[in-house]
Amino acid sequence: MYATAHFDGERINIEHRIYAVTPNGDRQYIDPSKDLKIDFWRYERRFARPLRDRKLDRIRPILGMVVERYPTFTELQVEDYPLIITRQGPRKAQRQVIAAISRAEVEEALK
């Protein structure tokens, strides 16, 4: 019912962003509302987190939409957008790719 406590210096992920990587290495942001027609919470809870955790069987319909929208992607990257908790308040932290899912993994999940 209550959120867990957070401490000084702790890194907290506040959002995830998904990118479709093209064969030439360009990263295309998969926009929740424009590309998938879903709101932030559905994007975060029903797509980004399962993708991050490689639970691809749970997100087949959304993966199908991604394949349709980005037919040449070679990889999906999950990037976190964290904050660091400090006594002076939260501060932005370095973003990083926390999961990379290959096109082959996506195709396998869609079978």
Give names to the regions the model predicted.
Residues 7-111:
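Extracytosolic and intramembrane catalytic regions of membrane-associated proteins
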